[in-house]
From Swiss-Prot:
The modification Serine amide is found at residue 73. GO terms for cellular component: extracellular region. Residues 1-23 form the signal peptide. It comes from the Eukaryota. Belongs to the formicidae venom clade 1 family. Expressed by the venom gland. Residues 24-53 form a propeptide. It is found in: Secreted. One of its GO terms (molecular function) is sodium channel regulator activity. Keywords: Amidation, Ion channel impairing toxin, Neurotoxin, Secreted, Signal, Toxin, Voltage-gated sodium channel impairing toxin. It comes from Pogonomyrmex rugosus. Its main location: secreted. This is Myrmicitoxin(1)-Pr3a.
């Protein structure tokens, strides 16, 4: 099975752009808003800020692993 190069590059670009949205600086709450919200909101904000972006990378990695035999044969 031959996979077009543009499709392969598109899948990689979409996967990487999805994982980069987790690192968006606008997603982090401001310190002033967190201080006004209380200790529970501060703990949640810290947990969200420290969360690793593993979820968007898992489909990309699994796709790449499944495409390796097709890439090597083609």
């Amino acid at each position: 099975m031959e996979i077009p190069k543009f499709l392969f590059i598109t899948v990689i670009a979409i996967g990487l752009s999805g994982s980069l949205t987790w690192a968006n600086p606008l997603a982090n709450p401001e310190a002033e808003a967190t201080a006004e919200a209380g200790p529970e909101a501060e703990a949640v904000a810290e947990a969200i800020g420290e969360a690793e972006p593993a979820l968007p990378l898992l489909p990309l990695i699994s796709l790449l692993v499944s495409l390796i035999p097709a890439i090597k044969s083609g």
